[in-house]
Each structure stands twice: as C-alpha cells, then as structure tokens.
Design a protein with these regions (language model features):
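Conserved beta-strand hairpin/beta-sheet module of binuclear metal-dependent hydrolase folds
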Residues: 1-46, 117-132, 137-138
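Core dinuclear metal-dependent hydrolase active-site scaffold
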Residues: 2-6, 16-19, 95-124, 128-129, ...
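Metallo-beta-lactamase
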Residues: 101, 111-228
C-alpha cells in the first residue's frame, strides 16, 4: 500500500493518491489530469475509484476528465446529487482497492453530502482518515457555505458538523493519520495549522473545535469571526455538480498566440479582461492600459476568484515567455475557462509595436519616509485586518484588498493617498484595478509593510486604534 499527498500551495489543497494490489484510488483530484495519468502509468496500476469528499467551492475538481480517461467510477457521499454518472455511497459503505478498504463516513455540516474516507489497511487496521473539509488541522470546515442549497442556517449546519465530529470522528483511534483537503491559507477555514498531516490524537488535544464542552459552545466558536466567502465559490460548486468543459479543450483555446494587433482587436470586440500575470515589479514599470495584475508568483488562483468574481469573464493573458500554460492551468483550477489567448512575445512585443502603455506611480519606502515627514498624508493599508491589527503605520486606514470592489467607490478622486500591502504583491493588484477604474490619485509603496518596517515611520500595534474605512 502507498499513500501520496499531492499538495498544491497556491490553493492550499491536498489531493491523495492511494495504490494497493495493482489498483488505485484518487481523492479530491485537481483539474489537470495528466500528472495523475503519469503516476498510474509509472506504477502500473489501474485507477478504480475517484473519491470526492464533497462538492468543492474553492476549486474545480478533475473528477470528470479523470473518469473519462480511465473509466474509474466517481464516488460521492450520501445525499449528493450530480448531473453525471456517479456512485452515491451509503454511510459505512466499504470500497475495496487491491488489498485495502475504504469506509465511507457521512459527516454533514460543512455541506450536506460531506464525507470522510477511512482507510483500512491489509491487516484490517484503521490507519488513515481523509477528512475533506470536515476536519482540518487546527480547525473544522466552515458551516456557512451550504446555507442556500441546504435551506439551513449556518448555526443549524454547525450543529450537524458537531454531531459528525463528536460522534463519528472523535471515537476513532488516536494513532490514525489525518489527511485534510486544505491547509493554512485556504478560505474554507479560519484557523488552520501550517502542517499538512497529523495524528487524530494530536488533533483531539490541540484543535479548538474538538475541545468544546457542548454543542452550543461548539456552534459559537466555529461560527465566530467567519469572513464572507469569495464570490466565485458558488459558481465552482455548480461546475463540480453539473460538469464542465474538458481541461484539454480549455488549455488548447487558452494557448492561442496572438500578435499585438490581434490581441487588441479581440479585446475590443469581446470585452475580455486583460490579465497580466507578471511580477508586481515588472507590471509597475509598464503595462497595457486597463489591464489587471495578479501575479503568478503568489496566491494567484484564489485572488483571481476574489477579484474577478465571474468565472464566465473572457480573459486575455499577458505573461512572461513560457508561463502561458501555467497561467491557463491555474485559472482553470478555479473555473476561469474562458481564456481567449495570450499576447505572443509578451509586453515587450506590445511596446515594440508602438502601442500605448501605462505605469504605476510607485516610490521606495525611503522616499515615502521623506514625504510622510514633510506633509500630512493619507495612508491606505490593504492587508488583511489581522495583519493590520498586528502592526501598522500610525494613522493608516484599513481597506483589505479582498473587498476592493466594495470600497473603491468611497474614494475621493481628488484626494491623494499612499497605498501599501505586505510586500507589494497585493498593492500592485489594487493599483491596477484602481487605474482601470479611472483612479490615479495615489502612490504605491514598493516592498510594502515589510520594507516600510525598516524605516523610522511611526507604527502601532494597538487594535483599539484600528481605522477602518467602510
């Protein structure tokens, strides 16, 4: 028997590959199937089952393409309803893979169909729990995402989650290894640990949600402090339930090279968003007017979903040479399949063609230090509120990037402000969005708070001084 965790940092997501006796199972696969196909071929095994822990909201699973290419059966937990062929398992149902077994544990709460998969080894020992979004390391799945489809409140779903965890998971042996679907950085939880696997015994000791005195306290703790989910989550759920275009077709369409004239014409005719995925430094120096920057060198896919929102938005790509396929692949993971092509030769080709360009007004933290001491200034901090509360520039306002589509209309076009994030990655995104919407009354700080913290600019770490602009 072999268990392999295939972890994707950009999504903080874990897929699992299990082999035994010439057969294999994959749990919660990503959209692109070729890496799995290659593993199967290398190991000389036949994929028998594709297990889905639930209808994922934060990414589009590869279950359909993988099933088409391997003839493996797709398995969901009880109550799941799909528009494609799938085995809807019963609670406690056993599936055999070679010499091992997988038992379905129906654990509703995060969603109604949410299920964990308990691995029983060749000797009959319960050895691993693939816990999906039911149990994370340090946290549990948020119970607010399925309210509409379940016709239940988040408190009612949290109550179901309590029953699932306390009656089905906690009675399991301490030595069982827990393999969750997500780790730190995922929007599917609020308090996840950085580790990607642990023993159930250690989680029983350290996970706050597993140490509540009763259901009421559990509901209160689990629902407290939940941030609104990204808008694209609902669309990803529908794609996972109903189906989607083949990844191969999406990739073929997205990898259409376009010379500047073609690129410009398609942008005008289609209304496509020009998405520039270069680093924030390269983008700030020069870019195609109206384009939006979300760099591949960071949490690319989640930010695309948070900022672009509509998965049906046509997209044209500007990338560094050789990064086109990675960009299309990572977009498809969160359901953005309408990539119409990429700018052949990248931004350099656009410049050489003599077409109009734009740039971000960016200054160094040293220059910012001089200016802040010379005059009264307005400062916008677009980091998460938790980062701001930990430490921030004295008198800075908190406006998290995740909510830019809500707060940008509050900006006074004639009032200048300085803007920063943690390192420059997020503030360049914000700058590109602001300039695309016609705002040019700001200066972005290179290197973000990390660089600013090395200067003498006054800082504060008192939460009571938080200034949040609605």
């Amino acid at each position: 028997m072999k268990i392999e965790q295939i972890y994707t940092g950009c999504l903080a997501q874990g897929a699992y590959y299990i082999t035994s006796g010439g057969e294999a199972a994959i749990i919660d696969p990503l959209r692109e199937t070729q890496p799995y196909i290659e593993r199967l071929k290398k190991d000389g095994v036949q994929l028998k089952y594709i297990f889905e822990t639930h209808f994922h909201a934060d990414f589009v699973s590869g279950h359909l393409d993988l099933s088409r290419k391997t003839n493996a059966s797709i398995v969901y937990g009880p109550t799941a309803q799909t528009e494609f062929d799938a085995i809807i398992a019963e609670d406690q149902q056993i599936f055999e893979i070679g010499d091992v077994k997988i038992k379905v544990l129906h654990t509703p709460g995060h969603t109604l169909e949410s299920s964990c998969y308990l691995l029983i080894d060749e000797s009959g020992n319960e050895t691993a729990l693939f816990s999906g979004d039911t149990l994370f390391l340090g946290d549990v799945g948020r119970p607010d995402l399925a309210q509409k489809s379940a016709d239940m409140t988040q408190n009612e779903l949290a109550g179901l989650l309590y029953e699932s965890l306390y009656h089905k998971i906690l009675p399991l042996a301490d030595e069982i290894t827990v393999y969750p679907a997500h780790g730190a950085g995922s929007a599917c939880g609020k308090n996840m640990q950085k580790e990607t696997l642990d023993t159930l015994g250690n989680q029983k000791k350290t996970n706050y949600a597993l140490n509540q005195k009763d259901k009421e306290s559990f509901i209160k703790e689990v629902t407290d402090g939940l941030l609104p989910p990204p808008a694209y989550f609902g669309m990803n759920v529908m794609m996972n339930k109903k189906g989607y275009d083949s990844f191969d077709e999406v990739l073929s369409q997205g990898l259409q090279p376009l010379v500047p004239e073609q690129f410009e014409e398609i942008a005008e005719v289609s209304g496509a968003l020009i998405l520039d995925v270069r680093s924030n430094g390269r983008f700030a120096e020069g870019f195609i007017p109206q384009s939006v920057n979300i760099g591949l060198d960071g949490d690319f896919a989640p930010w695309v979903g948070a900022l672009i929102v509509d998965v049906n938005q046509p997209i044209l790509l500007v990338t560094e040479k050789g990064e086109e396929e990675e960009a299309v692949t990572r977009l498809s993971r969160v359901g953005f399949d309408k990539v119409l092509g990429f700018l052949e030769g990248g931004f350099d080709a656009w410049k050489k063609s003599g077409k109009e360009t734009d740039a971000v007004h960016r200054i160094s933290p040293e220059q910012f230090e001089k200016e802040i001491h010379q005059k009264e200034v307005k400062i916008i901090d677009i980091r998460r509120e938790s980062e701001y509360n930990a430490e921030h520039i004295h008198e800075a306002y908190s406006k998290p990037l995740a909510y830019i589509n809500e707060w940008l209309h509050t900006i006074e076009p004639e009032e200048h402000f300085y803007m920063h994030c943690g390192s420059g990655y997020r503030s360049t995104m914000a700058a590109s969005i602001l300039q695309a919407r016609g705002y040019r009354n700001f200066t972005e700080i290179e290197g973000g708070f990390r660089a600013i913290s090395l200067t003498s600019i006054p800082k504060s770490d008192f939460v009571c001084q938080t200034k949040i602009l609605k």
